[in-house]
């Protein structure tokens, strides 16, 4: 039997395929997960840096998708993680939601959302979209009237308070072997404890220096699919990770120094994750699909004996 080459699951360079002609933000956005990149993953993930007040503003208008979606706005201040560096007004179901903190927004399939308007800008920050179940780029992003401006603002047509889908402040995971080694607690921004309708676990945090001990994450497995993102913190060079790491997947060492996404099918052993070099802070984000609770996600997984 031929051995698996797990390199096929590691996205070292993104596709630049969506968006354009928008000042003040990275456009096109960086696609780090799709069926074009990893056939059969049925996920779509893109991200981009916001450098200034976008122009035009808004440039994303009311639209909907046939898939559940999670939108993250992530502050890049490693000393004040929850400070977004801007103020955004995001319409969901015709209801305006305003925030100036790092947030996660869960949008069930079929719910209209947009426009998205930046009201203030103080520091660069990241916008990330995760589409669950999307089989193609078109299904994951280009949907409805996303780029078409309409007269007036959307009106609310139901009695749902869409605030319930917005995570303004994270649950904090600390006191574990992993968080102690990272010198930084993990911030949980999506789980069924936070959003009961969600069946996805997401935590993330900026890595402030070499973990100690290193590697902080041993080899382990999950009963769920996972995507691990490591995102560089330089908005002027977003593909540069600011570190060199070795990630063992199925006992195959994969070394990288760029922003990456790694898709991990359920049951595939992965780890340890070892830092070889460290230059500046970068973001570590595990996304575990189908694991709604912290207990199900088991951030360190089931250790392999």
Where are these regions (language model features)?
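Short acidic (Asp/Glu) patches
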Residues: 53-57, 92-93, 109-113, 210-214, ...
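Conserved metal-binding segment of the jelly-roll/cupin
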Residues: 96-119, 253-276
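Double-stranded beta-helix
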Residues: 1-18, 116-175, 239, 273-305
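Conserved short histidine dyad/triad with adjacent acidic residue
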Residues: 46-80, 202-227, 233
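A short beta-strand-loop-beta hairpin characteristic of the jelly-roll/cupin
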Residues: 73-100, 138-141, 232-258, 297
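Short connector loops at helix/strand junctions that flank enzyme active sites
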Residues: 42, 65-69, 83-85, 100, ...
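A short, N-terminal "cap"/entry segment at the start of jelly-roll beta-barrel domains
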Residues: 1-60, 147-214
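Short intrinsically disordered coil segments
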Residues: 62-63, 87-90, 143-149, 219-220, ...
């Amino acid at each position: 039997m031929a051995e698996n080459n797990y390199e096929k699951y590691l996205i070292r360079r993104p596709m630049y395929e969506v968006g354009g002609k928008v000042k003040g933000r990275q456009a096109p956005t960086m696609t780090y997960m799709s069926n074009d990149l990893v056939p059969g993953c049925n996920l779509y993930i893109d991200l981009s840096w916001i450098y200034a007040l976008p122009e035009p503003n808004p440039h994303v208008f009311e639209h909907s998708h046939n898939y559940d979606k999670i939108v993250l706005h992530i502050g890049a201040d490693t000393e004040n993680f929850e400070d977004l560096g801007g103020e955004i007004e995001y319409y969901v179901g015709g209801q305006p939601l305003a925030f100036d903190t790092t947030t996660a927004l869960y949008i069930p399939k079929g719910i209209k959302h947009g426009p998205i308007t930046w009201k203030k800008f103080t520091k660069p920050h990241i916008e990330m979209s995760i589409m669950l179940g999307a089989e193609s780029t078109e299904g994951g992003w280009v949907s409805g009237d996303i780029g078409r401006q309409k007269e007036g603002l959307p009106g609310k047509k139901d009695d749902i308070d869409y605030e319930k889908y917005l995570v303004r402040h994270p649950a904090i995971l600390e006191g574990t072997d992993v968080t102690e080694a990272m010198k930084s607690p993990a911030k949980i921004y999506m789980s069924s404890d936070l959003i009961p309708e969600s069946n996805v676990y997401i935590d993330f945090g900026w890595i402030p220096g070499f973990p100690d001990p290193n590697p902080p994450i041993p080899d382990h497995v999950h009963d769920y699919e996972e995507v691990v993102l490591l995102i560089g913190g330089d908005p002027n060079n977003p593909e540069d990770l600011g570190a060199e790491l070795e990630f063992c997947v199925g006992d195959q060492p994969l070394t990288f120094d760029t922003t990456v996404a790694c898709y991990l099918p359920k049951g595939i052993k992965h780890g340890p994750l070892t830092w070889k070099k460290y230059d500046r802070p970068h973001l570590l984000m595990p996304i575990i699909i189908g694991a709604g609770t912290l207990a199900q996600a088991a951030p360190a997984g089931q250790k392999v004996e």
